[in-house]
Protein backbone atom coordinates (compact mmCIF):
# COMPACT_ATOMS: atom_id res chain seq x y z
CA UNK A 1 0.00 0.00 0.00
CA UNK A 2 2.83 2.30 -0.86
CA UNK A 3 4.08 2.47 2.72
CA UNK A 4 0.81 4.04 3.90
CA UNK A 5 0.29 1.28 6.45
CA UNK A 6 3.16 0.40 8.73
CA UNK A 7 3.10 -1.83 11.76
CA UNK A 8 5.14 -4.82 12.96
CA UNK A 9 4.73 -7.85 10.74
CA UNK A 10 3.00 -6.15 7.79
CA UNK A 11 4.45 -7.33 4.50
CA UNK A 12 5.86 -4.40 2.55
CA UNK A 13 7.29 -6.07 -0.55
CA UNK A 14 5.30 -6.88 -3.69
CA UNK A 15 3.28 -9.99 -2.89
CA UNK A 16 3.40 -12.90 -5.32
CA UNK A 17 2.07 -16.42 -4.84
CA UNK A 18 0.42 -15.60 -1.51
CA UNK A 19 -2.96 -14.26 -0.51
CA UNK A 20 -2.94 -10.46 -0.38
CA UNK A 21 -5.83 -10.09 2.10
CA UNK A 22 -4.26 -9.39 5.49
CA UNK A 23 -7.07 -10.98 7.49
CA UNK A 24 -6.73 -14.20 5.57
CA UNK A 25 -2.92 -14.17 5.57
CA UNK A 26 -2.40 -13.43 9.26
CA UNK A 27 -5.51 -14.87 10.92
CA UNK A 28 -6.32 -17.84 8.71
CA UNK A 29 -2.93 -19.12 7.63
CA UNK A 30 -3.44 -17.85 4.09
CA UNK A 31 -6.36 -20.17 3.37
CA UNK A 32 -9.90 -18.84 3.06
CA UNK A 33 -12.48 -18.70 0.30
CA UNK A 34 -13.38 -15.05 0.89
CA UNK A 35 -10.00 -13.79 -0.24
CA UNK A 36 -10.18 -14.88 -3.88
CA UNK A 37 -8.69 -17.65 -5.96
CA UNK A 38 -4.89 -17.62 -6.10
CA UNK A 39 -3.06 -19.57 -8.75
CA UNK A 40 -1.94 -19.23 -12.34
CA UNK A 41 -4.26 -19.07 -15.34
CA UNK A 42 -3.73 -22.71 -16.32
CA UNK A 43 -4.62 -24.10 -12.89
CA UNK A 44 -7.62 -21.77 -12.49
CA UNK A 45 -8.87 -22.89 -15.91
CA UNK A 46 -8.64 -26.50 -14.71
CA UNK A 47 -10.64 -25.65 -11.58
CA UNK A 48 -13.22 -23.84 -13.72
CA UNK A 49 -13.43 -26.85 -16.03
CA UNK A 50 -14.12 -29.08 -13.02
CA UNK A 51 -16.88 -26.69 -11.97
CA UNK A 52 -18.31 -26.72 -15.49
CA UNK A 53 -18.35 -30.49 -16.02
CA UNK A 54 -17.69 -32.15 -12.66
CA UNK A 55 -14.35 -33.47 -13.86
CA UNK A 56 -11.16 -32.84 -15.74
CA UNK A 57 -9.72 -35.04 -18.45
CA UNK A 58 -10.61 -38.66 -17.68
CA UNK A 59 -11.30 -37.96 -14.00
CA UNK A 60 -14.74 -37.29 -12.47
CA UNK A 61 -14.69 -35.50 -9.14
CA UNK A 62 -18.29 -34.40 -8.53
CA UNK A 63 -21.69 -35.82 -9.41
CA UNK A 64 -24.36 -33.58 -10.94
CA UNK A 65 -26.09 -33.45 -7.54
CA UNK A 66 -22.93 -32.15 -5.87
CA UNK A 67 -22.40 -29.62 -8.68
CA UNK A 68 -25.97 -28.41 -8.24
CA UNK A 69 -25.42 -28.07 -4.48
CA UNK A 70 -22.29 -25.95 -5.12
CA UNK A 71 -24.01 -23.61 -7.54
CA UNK A 72 -27.66 -23.38 -6.44
CA UNK A 73 -28.81 -20.12 -4.83
CA UNK A 74 -28.28 -20.37 -1.08
CA UNK A 75 -31.16 -18.09 -0.13
CA UNK A 76 -34.47 -17.39 -1.83
CA UNK A 77 -33.93 -13.65 -1.60
CA UNK A 78 -30.29 -13.80 -2.75
CA UNK A 79 -30.09 -15.60 -6.09
CA UNK A 80 -26.54 -14.31 -6.60
CA UNK A 81 -24.85 -16.48 -3.95
CA UNK A 82 -23.84 -20.12 -4.32
CA UNK A 83 -21.62 -22.22 -2.07
CA UNK A 84 -18.23 -20.55 -2.45
CA UNK A 85 -19.24 -19.02 -5.79
CA UNK A 86 -20.92 -15.86 -6.89
CA UNK A 87 -23.85 -16.34 -9.25
CA UNK A 88 -25.15 -13.96 -11.87
CA UNK A 89 -28.55 -14.94 -10.47
CA UNK A 90 -30.74 -11.86 -10.47
CA UNK A 91 -28.34 -9.71 -12.52
CA UNK A 92 -26.59 -8.38 -9.42
CA UNK A 93 -23.11 -9.34 -10.62
CA UNK A 94 -23.09 -7.62 -14.02
CA UNK A 95 -20.00 -5.59 -13.07
CA UNK A 96 -18.16 -8.93 -13.06
CA UNK A 97 -20.10 -11.08 -15.54
CA UNK A 98 -21.35 -8.40 -17.94
CA UNK A 99 -25.01 -7.83 -18.77
CA UNK A 100 -25.48 -10.83 -21.09
CA UNK A 101 -24.36 -13.74 -18.89
CA UNK A 102 -27.08 -16.31 -18.10
CA UNK A 103 -28.45 -16.37 -14.55
CA UNK A 104 -26.67 -19.66 -13.76
CA UNK A 105 -23.22 -18.24 -14.57
CA UNK A 106 -20.92 -18.61 -11.56
CA UNK A 107 -17.52 -17.24 -10.72
CA UNK A 108 -15.21 -15.64 -8.23
CA UNK A 109 -13.37 -12.36 -8.29
CA UNK A 110 -10.48 -11.12 -6.24
CA UNK A 111 -9.49 -7.71 -4.88
CA UNK A 112 -6.16 -7.88 -6.67
CA UNK A 113 -7.95 -7.79 -10.05
CA UNK A 114 -8.88 -11.37 -10.89
CA UNK A 115 -11.98 -12.97 -12.37
CA UNK A 116 -12.88 -16.61 -12.91
CA UNK A 117 -16.20 -17.02 -14.73
CA UNK A 118 -18.06 -20.21 -15.67
CA UNK A 119 -21.04 -20.08 -18.05
CA UNK A 120 -22.65 -23.54 -18.36
CA UNK A 121 -25.08 -22.42 -21.09
CA UNK A 122 -22.30 -21.43 -23.50
CA UNK A 123 -19.86 -24.04 -22.11
CA UNK A 124 -17.53 -21.09 -21.45
CA UNK A 125 -14.72 -20.62 -18.96
CA UNK A 126 -12.97 -17.27 -18.51
CA UNK A 127 -9.88 -16.72 -16.38
CA UNK A 128 -8.78 -13.09 -16.33
CA UNK A 129 -5.84 -12.06 -14.15
CA UNK A 130 -4.63 -8.48 -13.67
CA UNK A 131 -2.21 -6.86 -11.26
CA UNK A 132 -4.22 -3.73 -10.51
CA UNK A 133 -3.06 -3.74 -6.88
CA UNK A 134 0.60 -3.81 -7.95
CA UNK A 135 0.37 -0.14 -8.91
CA UNK A 136 1.04 3.00 -6.88
CA UNK A 137 -1.49 4.20 -4.31
CA UNK A 138 -3.28 7.24 -5.76
CA UNK A 139 -3.31 9.29 -2.53
CA UNK A 140 -1.89 7.58 0.56
CA UNK A 141 -3.31 10.15 2.96
CA UNK A 142 -6.84 10.05 1.54
CA UNK A 143 -7.20 6.29 1.03
CA UNK A 144 -4.40 3.69 1.17
CA UNK A 145 -6.68 1.23 -0.70
CA UNK A 146 -7.16 3.39 -3.80
CA UNK A 147 -4.60 2.17 -6.31
CA UNK A 148 -3.88 3.73 -9.71
CA UNK A 149 -4.74 0.33 -11.17
CA UNK A 150 -8.35 0.80 -10.06
CA UNK A 151 -8.69 3.39 -12.83
CA UNK A 152 -7.37 1.16 -15.62
CA UNK A 153 -9.90 -0.29 -18.05
CA UNK A 154 -8.42 -3.72 -17.32
CA UNK A 155 -9.56 -3.51 -13.69
CA UNK A 156 -13.20 -3.18 -14.73
CA UNK A 157 -13.70 -6.94 -14.83
CA UNK A 158 -17.18 -6.99 -16.39
CA UNK A 159 -15.95 -5.51 -19.66
CA UNK A 160 -14.18 -8.79 -20.49
CA UNK A 161 -17.39 -10.81 -20.27
CA UNK A 162 -19.30 -8.08 -22.06
CA UNK A 163 -16.90 -8.29 -25.02
CA UNK A 164 -17.19 -12.08 -25.15
CA UNK A 165 -20.97 -11.98 -25.43
CA UNK A 166 -21.04 -9.42 -28.26
CA UNK A 167 -22.24 -10.88 -31.53
Segments predicted by a language model, with ranges:
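Short, gly/Ser/Thr-rich active-site loops of penicillin-recognizing serine hydrolases
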Residues: 53-56, 65-66, 71-79, 90-93, ...
Amino acid sequence: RGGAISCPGVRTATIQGQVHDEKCYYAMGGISGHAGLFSNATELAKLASVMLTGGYGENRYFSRNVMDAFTAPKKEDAANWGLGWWREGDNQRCWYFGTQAPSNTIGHQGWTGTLTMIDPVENLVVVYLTNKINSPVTDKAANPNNFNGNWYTASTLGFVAQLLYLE
